[in-house]
Amino acid sequence: MSAPNPKAFPLADEKLSQQILDVVQQAANLRQLKKGANEATKTLNRGISEFIIMAADCEPIEILLHLPLLCEDKNVPYVFVPSRVALGRACGVSRPVIAASITTNDASAIKNQIYAVKDKIETLLI
């Protein structure tokens, strides 16, 4: 596999990527996940996004580089994971997914896990 694109910052390490993908999988089961760059953009604009996950191996990467700018405007943490195929599998679809958004739900069963991962992503951004 080639080196990840240098524009894909901050890139999660293997351990954090696994935690993120686990939370993504649980959020997909609880209908708390939006898949794709367009739907992720919509959640940011509506203010219902907890954090954004993007694939670092997206080609061309420019098709999702509007998301970090929007995230910074809306004060939402974001992170890149190494593989779009792994992100697609975690989202529960058979196709690669280049971006996903975990949405807000205060009554969620995985609220604590979402906040734990969100804190780790925020420390990457510092």
UniProtKB/Swiss-Prot annotation:
Known Pfam families for this protein? Ribosomal_L7Ae
- Where this protein primarily resides, as one coarse class? nucleus
Provide the alphabetized UniProt keywords. mRNA processing, mRNA splicing, Nucleus, Ribonucleoprotein, Ribosome biogenesis, RNA-binding, rRNA processing, Spliceosome
Q: Where is it found, in Gene Ontology cellular component terms?
A: box C/D methylation guide snoRNP complex; nucleolus; small-subunit processome; spliceosomal complex; U4/U6 x U5 tri-snRNP complex
Where in or outside the cell it occurs: the entry states: Nucleus, Nucleolus
Q: Does the keyword Ribosomal protein apply?
A: no
Q: Which InterPro entries match?
A: eL8/uL1-like (IPR050257), H/ACA_rnp_Nhp2-like (IPR002415), Ribosomal_eL30-like_sf (IPR029064), Ribosomal_eL8-like_CS (IPR004037), Ribosomal_eL8/eL30/eS12/Gad45 (IPR004038), Ribosomal_eL8/Nhp2 (IPR018492)
Against PROSITE patterns, the record matches this protein to:
RIBOSOMAL_L7AE
Which is a GO BP term held by this UniProt record? maturation of SSU-rRNA from tricistronic rRNA transcript (SSU-rRNA, 5.8S rRNA, LSU-rRNA)
Please name the GO terms that the record assigns under molecular function.
U3 snoRNA binding; U4 snRNA binding
Classification via PANTHER family: RIBOSOMAL PROTEIN L7AE FAMILY MEMBER (PTHR23105)
Report the sequence similarity comment from the record.
Answer: Belongs to the eukaryotic ribosomal protein eL8 family.
Per UniProt, subunit arrangement is:
Component of the U3 snoRNP particle. Binds to the C'/D and B/C motifs in U3 snoRNA. Component of the 25S U4/U6.U5 tri-snRNP particle, a subcomplex of the spliceosome. Binds to the 5' stem-loop of U4 snRNA.
Q: Per its database record, what is this protein's job?
A: Common component of the spliceosome and rRNA processing machinery. In association with the spliceosomal U4/U6.U5 tri-snRNP particle, required for splicing of pre-mRNA. In association with box C/D snoRNPs, required for processing of pre-ribosomal RNA (rRNA) and site-specific 2'-O-methylation of substrate RNAs. Essential for the accumulation and stability of U4 snRNA, U6 snRNA, and box C/D snoRNAs.
Q: What is this protein called?
A: 13 kDa ribonucleoprotein-associated protein
Give the species: Candida glabrata (strain ATCC 2001 / BCRC 20586 / JCM 3761 / NBRC 0622 / NRRL Y-65 / CBS 138) (Yeast)
- Name the gene behind this protein: SNU13
